[in-house]
């Protein structure tokens, strides 16, 4: 394994700065930008370029064949929920190395699915999990350990052990939210087997802090950087990223849905999978897959019960 000190232009002091800034992993270093590395590690941009170039050579980052991509995708894992219909809709569960977005009005089940995934990621692979831990970035004060207990009971898991493997960060503004996402690298490098990152909800702070058309460009730029950091974590560490999103009304809509997901094209392009949640009759929920690189559009019906998500 190549160590930081083995790279050209990296002495003990530079290596220490890189580790302190969360760049101890060679792939994390290879996928950074010179500006990002320069700012976070407090090194010159010229040095940053040389370090990144050396890291890319050590990781052999170059063109690869479609066959190589297929082989790499064999490492992709899936995190299931208690509804077989929902799992089938998204190809077996929430996918690692990807960002999955669910959006819908309040009470449509976004946070409920988030809580369930925080538990099921801890299941062994043969039961639909990844034997992993979860990071839960809570922006709206919706995380409830009591709900985790109910779902863990439904899966007959040890409640204390389940709670210990969920790392919760209460984000109070968009800058804090971005910082907590960046600190996930440190958690992983400390030996925590993080396999799922949940952001519930992604846009709440951005929506509240950047008001008016004149601030839209700044908001979208900041959001894009945040999503890029989340995707980098997903790719580097084979992690699933699950984000919930709000909707807004379309008053000029006479046909189709009267609501749409917020976040604009930046979020639309960043999300690998997009799932629209709707309320149905008799307490049912409807999940519709509206965007995927390889799965067809479709929908399923599920219910939310004390023990979690069920068909």
Swiss-Prot record:
PROSITE patterns cross-referenced by the UniProt entry: RECA_2 (PS50162), RECA_3 (PS50163)
Domain of life (superkingdom): Archaea
Source organism (scientific name): Methanobrevibacter smithii (strain ATCC 35061 / DSM 861 / OCM 144 / PS)
UniProt: ATP binding residues: 104-111
PANTHER family hit by this protein: MEIOTIC RECOMBINATION PROTEIN DMC1_LIM15 HOMOLOG, RECA/RAD51/RADA DNA STRAND-PAIRING FAMILY MEMBER
Signal peptide range: none
Entry protein name: DNA repair and recombination protein RadA
Protein family membership: Belongs to the eukaryotic RecA-like protein family.
One biological process term in Gene Ontology: DNA repair
GO-annotated molecular function: ATP binding; ATP hydrolysis activity; ATP-dependent DNA damage sensor activity; damaged DNA binding
Lineage, broadest ranks: Archaea, Methanobacteriati, Methanobacteriota, Methanomada group, Methanobacteria
Keywords: ATP-binding, DNA damage, DNA recombination, DNA-binding, Nucleotide-binding
HAMAP family named among the record's database cross-references: RadA_arch
InterPro entries xref list: AAA+_ATPase, DNA_recomb/repair_Rad51_C, DNA_recomb/repair_RadA, DNA_recomb/repair_RecA-like, DNA_repair_Rad51/TF_NusA_a-hlx, Hlx-hairpin-Hlx_DNA-bd_motif, P-loop_NTPase, RecA_ATP-bd
Gene: radA
Keyword Plastid: no
Function: Involved in DNA repair and in homologous recombination. Binds and assemble on single-stranded DNA to form a nucleoprotein filament. Hydrolyzes ATP in a ssDNA-dependent manner and promotes DNA strand exchange between homologous DNA molecules.
Transmembrane segments: none
């Amino acid at each position: 394994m190549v160590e930081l000190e083995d790279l050209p232009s990296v002495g003990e002091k530079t290596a220490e700065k890189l580790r302190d800034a969360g760049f101890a992993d060679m792939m994390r270093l290879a996928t950074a930008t010179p500006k990002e590395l320069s700012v976070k590690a407090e090194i010159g941009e010229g040095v940053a370029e040389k370090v990144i170039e050396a890291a890319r050579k050590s990781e052999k980052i170059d063109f690869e064949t479609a066959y190589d991509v297929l082989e790499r995708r064999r490492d992709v894992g899936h995190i299931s929920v208690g509804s077989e219909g929902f799992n089938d809709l998204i190809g077996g569960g929430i996918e690692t190395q990807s960002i999955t977005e669910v959006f819908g009005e309040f009470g449509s089940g976004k946070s409920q699915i988030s809580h369930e995934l925080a538990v099921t990621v801890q299941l062994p692979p043969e039961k639909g999990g990844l034997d992993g831990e979860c990071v839960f970035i809570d922006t709206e004060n919706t995380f409830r350990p009591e709900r985790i207990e109910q779902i863990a009971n439904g899966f007959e898991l040890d409640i204390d052990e389940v709670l210990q493997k969920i790392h919760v960060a209460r984000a109070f503004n968009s800058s804090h939210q971005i910082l907590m996402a960046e600190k996930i690298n440190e958690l992983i490098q400390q030996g925590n087997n993080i396999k799922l990152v949940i952001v519930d909800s992604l846009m709440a702070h951005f929506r509240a802090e950047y008001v008016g058309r004149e601030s839209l460009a700044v908001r979208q730029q900041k959001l894009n950087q945040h999503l890029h950091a989340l995707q980098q974590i997903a790719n580097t560490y084979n992690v699933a990223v699950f984000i919930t999103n709000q909707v807004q009304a379309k008053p000029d809509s006479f046909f189709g849905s009267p609501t749409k997901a917020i976040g604009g094209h930046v979020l639309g392009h960043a999300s690998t999978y997009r799932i629209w949640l709707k309320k149905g009759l008799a307490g049912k929920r409807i999940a519709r897959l509206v965007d995927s690189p390889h799965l067809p559009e479709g929908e399923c019906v599920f219910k939310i019960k004390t023990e979690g998500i069920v068909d």
